[in-house]
Amino acid sequence: MADYLISGGTGYIPDDGLSAQQLFAVGDGLTYNDFLILPGFIDFTSDEVDLTSALTKKITLKTPLISSPMDTVTESSMAIAMALMGGIGIIHHNCTPEFQANEVRKVKRFEQGFITDPVVLSPHHTVGDVLEAKVRHGFSGIPITETGKMGSKLVGIVTSRDIDFLSEKDNNKYLEEAMTKREDLVVAPAGVTLKEANDILQRSKKGKLPIVNDKDELVAIIARTDLKKNRDYPLASKDSRKQLLCGAAIGTREDDKYRLDLLTQSGVDMVVLDSSQGNSVYQINMIHYIKQKYPELQVVGGNVVTAAQAKNLIDAGVDALRVGMGCGSICITQEVMACGRPQGTSVYKVAEYARRFGVPVIADGGIQTVGHVVKALSLGASTVMMGSLLAATTEAPGEYFFSDGVRLKKYRGMGSLDAMEKNTSSQKRYFSEGDKVKVAQGVSGSVQDKGSIHKFVPYLIAGIQHGCQDIGAKSLSVLRSMMYSGELKFEKRTMSAQVEGGVHGLHSFEKRLY
């Protein structure tokens, strides 16, 4: 045996790594890439890991993921998909109060399998309009009503079978000539269950099943393609009435009180006070107002990055805190305003303080990979809010476009001039609605197509579970208790360590995540 090797028992284990307290004791601001978590002992499978976590004082999610209130990330389609997967979506407020309230209403009224806001045309639209809708939305089975709107009398339907063999000169042909007429349609009455509707659709061998009320007005539609996708969502985030959970963002100005009233009438479960710097008299006054008028409504305050900021909002009565300033991929606040904080340090410092008062923390921004999600949760965050990671999914607002053969969707910061020019709500978020000269705190860009949330979020969930398994934490509550007890160990990474931890030494490679 080599002379440097010692023969003996294994009772001795050297101290290794740093506790979170030691890691953040130094004054350096740390991002998620600046450290790693040391592995622990595995005695369970990854699918046993429980990801249940508190969103607010009274709302718990089975998946700790939230979609950000940005106008290129979250409207009703995203919020529905996130809630079905066990997370929640926060509807943006860079729009009219009426539009936002209607988006919330769509989420709360959602029934799995029933499409309540399909593309609808009138008999006076043309075949060209159908072809255009097919390019934009990817399907051509479109119900035809008298006015071209939902709630109007059903007069027919146009499917690919009706138009596939028409020539280009027929593009101006009216749909009343091309459509399948009402008398030839199979329909189901309003109030039918999803199972009954599915049975009718299967027996009829049709592609679409319109749902009509007793006046023969269109109220919903079921698609055969959705039948294949229809499955149980055991993790779905629901309220006591079995409706999907939905949040919405509002500002802190006087006119936001009207927006708040409309949102509560729509059944919103929580409001997020959307401000780049939450420690303000405006936000504190708004928290007091909401808690007085709607005491049961959950209120998320922020954004904050220090315990001192958090204290004022906790004292005002918030039910959760949103943490992050200048760390988003499209955010230039730190560059322009010289204000902010690296996100790793922000999450740890605020979460460590807020937990003493039972206030959960949402890590908002800077999430580029599933590993970053695990790191945020290991630093004390209860949930993680994502923007760019969910942008360019099928459910995100906006239309796809191609650039150099790559399928993209637009993504922009709410502090970008683009967003500010669209609506004053974005200006209020950055306290600049009265400024003659607008100072941008965000940029506009594009993100590559990621496919559907229904495929992407399961990848994130599996990644978080595997991360917790490697750490040796069977649940997120165990993960946080390990961190606060000092059992969870971290290690700083040098720049060369970060290079080593990524793909390196290859001539070329393809990175497929799922």
Swiss-Prot record:
The keyword RNA-binding does not apply. NAD(+) binds at D274, S275, S276, G324, M325, G326. Its EC number is 1.1.1.205. Belongs to the IMPDH/GMPR family. K(+) binds at G326, G328, C331, E500, G501, G502. The keyword Iron does not apply. Pathway: Purine metabolism; XMP biosynthesis via de novo pathway; XMP from IMP: step 1/1. One of its GO terms (molecular function) is IMP dehydrogenase activity. This is Inosine-5'-monophosphate dehydrogenase 1b. Its main location: cytoplasm. Mycophenolic acid (MPA) is a non-competitive inhibitor that prevents formation of the closed enzyme conformation by binding to the same site as the amobile flap. In contrast, mizoribine monophosphate (MZP) is a competitive inhibitor that induces the closed conformation. MPA is a potent inhibitor of mammalian IMPDHs but a poor inhibitor of the bacterial enzymes. MZP is a more potent inhibitor of bacterial IMPDH. It is an enzyme of class 1 (oxidoreductase). It is found in: Cytoplasm; Nucleus. The active site is at C331 (thioimidate intermediate), R429 (proton acceptor). Its cofactor is K(+). It comes from the Eukaryota. CDD domains: CBS_pair_IMPDH, IMPDH. Homotetramer. Catalyzes the conversion of inosine 5'-phosphate (IMP) to xanthosine 5'-phosphate (XMP), the first committed and rate-limiting step in the de novo synthesis of guanine nucleotides, and therefore plays an important role in the regulation of cell growth.
